[in-house]
């Protein structure tokens, strides 16, 4: 019996990370989606066709009770995204209602503590540095300034008193870190190794999910070591990972699973590396 138990534990530990979910998906309700076919029904079909057990709708959201929204975000309040409810049902897929909120340059988070109760999962990006809302003109002027902000924003988020068991940190290697690819890669190169180790040890302790984002994975082509470095360090520090297509269109949905598969192989992820949403 002891040998059987050891063998079973070894099997579970060595089991390849299963691609069975997508926790970052936008519908046409998000203002930056321009695909009328990107409906909840189409998203559910994507999940069923790929054998997923869980998905989450995460349209852009800024809580109307929190000051500091941009004009673009202020229109995407709770009533706006709740138009998606009720979500379609499936016997095979749990379809969660979530949101992608924002954090401005003053580290004001666009969701109140009370509002978390209305969502099954909340995606929080720290790398939307293409938005004036999130970075000063001075910091945004150089890759060095952007690298400093990359660190301080993630640090600031992790210092907050939040229900991290139902939060994912989105696209940490996103191309929106900088406009030009050369600058984007330079920012990622400038992130200090020790700071990354410290931040991801902190993230692991908090129990927050780290997103493997389809867009980040696409951006890794030809620059794998640079773009995937934060995730390699996150894995080493004990972080747990979830998958997010960040799809705003049906074409992006269709491309997601292949990208996820590449990232799982590149990072050699096992089931024990998987983030599970806690209520």
Where are these regions (language model features)?
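Charged catalytic cores and adjacent phosphate/nucleic-acid-binding surfaces used
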Residues: 3-28, 184-279
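Short, flexible, glycine/charge-rich loop motifs used to bind or transfer phosphoryl groups or to couple energy/partner
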Residues: 10-12, 85-86, 111-113, 157-160, ...
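Generic structural signal for hydrophobic
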Residues: 43-47, 114, 157-160, 203, ...
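Short loop/turn motifs at secondary-structure junctions
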Residues: 51-53, 118, 163-168, 268-270
């Amino acid at each position: 019996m002891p040998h059987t138990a050891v063998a079973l534990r070894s099997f579970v530990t060595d089991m390849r990370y299963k691609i069975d979910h997508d926790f970052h998906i936008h519908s046409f309700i998000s203002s930056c989606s321009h695909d009328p076919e990107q409906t909840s029904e189409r998203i559910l079909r994507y999940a069923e066709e790929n054998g997923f057990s869980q998905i989450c709708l995460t349209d852009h959201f800024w809580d109307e009770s929190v000051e500091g929204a941009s004009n673009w975000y202020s229109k995407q309040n709770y009533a706006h995204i709740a138009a998606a409810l009720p979500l379609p049902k499936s016997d095979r897929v749990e379809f969660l209602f979530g949101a992608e909120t924002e954090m401005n340059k003053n580290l004001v988070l666009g969701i109140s503590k009370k509002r978390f109760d209305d969502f099954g999962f909340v995606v929080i990006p720290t790398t939307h540095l293409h938005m004036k809302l999130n970075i000063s003109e001075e910091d945004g002027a150089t890759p060095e300034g952007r690298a400093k902000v990359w660190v301080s924003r993630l640090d600031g988020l992790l210092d907050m008193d939040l229900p991290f068991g139902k939060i994912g940190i989105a696209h940490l290697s996103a191309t929106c870190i900088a406009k030009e690819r050369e600058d984007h890669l330079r920012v990622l190169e400038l992130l200090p190794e020790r700071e990354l180790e410290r931040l991801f040890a902190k993230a692991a302790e908090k129990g927050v999910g780290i997103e493997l984002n389809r867009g980040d994975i696409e951006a890794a082509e030809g620059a794998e070591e640079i773009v995937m470095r934060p995730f390699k360090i996150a894995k080493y520090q004990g972080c747990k990972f979830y998958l997010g297509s960040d799809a705003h269109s049906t074409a992006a949905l269709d491309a997601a699973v292949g990208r996820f598969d590449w990232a799982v192989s590149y990072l050699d992820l096992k089931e024990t590396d998987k983030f599970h949403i806690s209520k």
